[in-house]
Each structure stands twice: as structure tokens, then as C-alpha cells.
């Protein structure tokens, strides 16, 4: 009997875990509730994302892992985003550039006749 009750309790718990938010709106974990007006130094920012929704915002993720929401229309926010994009483009260009000039073939196959 105890095993049956324990099994039913486990099934109910599992069902509640799997079916989260049925009949209700599940909020997005990337939603901002307020925006900061305090400038963040570019050197402390690791990356950013832009959210759309009831409150449009730029979410800066600092090198320490903190998430800071800022107004995308603010001048300092646009400057930081531009700076981050420039860094990203520079990094991507360095990765994608191919060396110029000719390289010697690495094919070392030898044909023996005889």
C-alpha cells in the first residue's frame, strides 16, 4: 500500500514538473522589468542580446555573469552595441582570412617504376 502511494505521489510530481504552465502564460526568463540608466564600461561586458516584447531592451551580460537591462534608444547603449559588434566583426574577419601566396603541396605520394 505504501509503495502504491509513493508511486502515485511520484507520478503526480513528475506530471506537475513536465506540464508547467498549462492554462497560464509562462513568462520569458529574458524579460526585463526595468531599465538601467547607469553607463556600463565596454570592458566589463561579455555579450548582449536584444529583446522584443512589452519592454524592448538590450540585455548586457557582464564578464561576471550579471544581466543588466538597458534602453536600446539611449546613446551610450547604442555606442556599446556598436563597439561590441565591431569587436565581433574584427574577430570573425581574423578567423575567416586565408593566407595569401602559394603553398607547397603536402602530397608525398611516390610512384615507383621498375
From Swiss-Prot:
Disulfide bonds: 32-69
Tissue expr: Highest level in spleen, lower in peripheral leukocytes and very low levels in lung, colon and small intestine.
Gene3D superfamilies according to UniProt: 2.40.50.40
GO annotation (BP), single: cellular response to transforming growth factor beta stimulus
Keyword annotations: Chemotaxis, Cytokine, Disulfide bond, Secreted, Signal
Gene Ontology cellular component annotations, sorted alphabetically: extracellular region; extracellular space
Signal peptide region: 1-21
Molecular functions per Gene Ontology: CCR chemokine receptor binding; chemokine activity; chemokine receptor binding; protein homodimerization activity
Region (Disordered): 91-114
Pfam families assigned: IL8
Compartments reported by the entry: Secreted
InterPro entries: Chemokine_b/g/d, Chemokine_IL8-like_dom, Chemokine_XCL1/XCL2, Interleukin_8-like_sf
Domain of life: Eukaryota
Function noted in UniProt: Chemotactic activity for lymphocytes but not for monocytes or neutrophils. In thymus, mediates medullary accumulation of thymic dendritic cells and contributes to regulatoy T cell development, playing a role in self-tolerance establishment.
PANTHER family in the record: CYTOKINE SCM-1 BETA-RELATED, SMALL INDUCIBLE CYTOKINE A
Family the entry assigns: Belongs to the intercrine gamma family.
Annotated protein name in UniProt: Lymphotactin
Amino acid at each position: 500500500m505504501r509503495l502504491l502511494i509513493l508511486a502515485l505521489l511520484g507520478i503526480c510530481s513528475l506530471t506537475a514538473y513536465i506540464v508547467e504552465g498549462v492554462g497560464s502564460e509562462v513568462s520569458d526568463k529574458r524579460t526585463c522589468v526595468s531599465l538601467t540608466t547607469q553607463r556600463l564600461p565596454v570592458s566589463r561586458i561579455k555579450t548582449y542580446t536584444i529583446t522584443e516584447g512589452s519592454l524592448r531592451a538590450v540585455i548586457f551580460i557582464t564578464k561576471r555573469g550579471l544581466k543588466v537591462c538597458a534602453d536600446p534608444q539611449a546613446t551610450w547603449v547604442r555606442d556599446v552595441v556598436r563597439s561590441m559588434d565591431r569587436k565581433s566583426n574584427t574577430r570573425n574577419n581574423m578567423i575567416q582570412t586565408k593566407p595569401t601566396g602559394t603553398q607547397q603541396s603536402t602530397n608525398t605520394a611516390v610512384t615507383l617504376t621498375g
